[in-house]
Design a protein with these regions (language model features):
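Class I Rossmann-like S-adenosyl-L-methionine
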Residues: 2-107
Length: 107
């Protein structure tokens, strides 16, 4: 697969790159996440956050898409896959992760 060459530096980058690979290459979440976690060299706490962001976004995609459809004037099919992945991940943090401050979720 043509995974992203850039080395992720943060838990959110690991999660975003994993979600991009899943959306664009039909990669499995486990394989994509493992690939980027191994390249990032995060400590266990940051690796756990990256895993939670990735799996949580995937597991709650139906709910997240419902919110996006409700509040967006643009149809989801018209949104670029990487933009949609970022919107889903940010929304997941805002509505389902109570310990993530809003400014961090959208940064």
């Amino acid at each position: 697969t043509a995974m992203i060459d850039k080395r992720p530096k943060t838990p959110r980058e690991v999660a975003a790159f994993s979600l991009f690979s899943m959306a664009e290459e039909a990669a499995w979440s486990d394989g994509a996440l493992h690939h980027y976690l191994s390249r990032a060299g995060l400590d266990s706490r940051d690796a756990a956050l990256a895993s939670r962001l990735t799996y949580g976004t995937v597991q709650n995609q139906i709910l997240l898409d419902w919110y996006l459809r409700h509040f967006s004037s643009v149809r989801l099919k018209k949104i670029a896959p990487r933009v949609l992945a970022c919107l889903r991940m940010g929304l997941y943090q805002l509505i389902l992760m109570d310990k993530i401050p809003a400014h961090a979720a959208v940064a």
